[in-house]
UniProtKB/Swiss-Prot annotation:
Short name of one Pfam family: Cuticle_1
InterPro entries per UniProt: Cuticle_1
Protein name: Cuticle protein CP434
Keyword Repeat: yes
Entry keyword set: Cuticle, Repeat
GO molecular function: structural constituent of cuticle
Annotated tissue distribution: Calcified shell.
Claim: Repeat is one of the keywords in the record: yes
Length: 43
């Protein structure tokens, strides 16, 4: 995966856009939790 300040590209090529004004605070193998409480489930 490639991770940048505004999003990431997963190993399979799927782009993930991070929520505006939120930073990833917890990253694990199955998802990401952001500073605003939103979470993204990874494949």
């Amino acid at each position: 995966a490639l991770v940048g300040p505004s999003g990431m590209i997963l190993a399979d090529g799927t782009p993930v856009q991070f929520p505006a004004h939120a930073k990833p605070v917890l990253t694990g193998p199955s998802g990401i939790v952001f500073s605003n409480g939103q979470n993204i489930q990874l494949h």
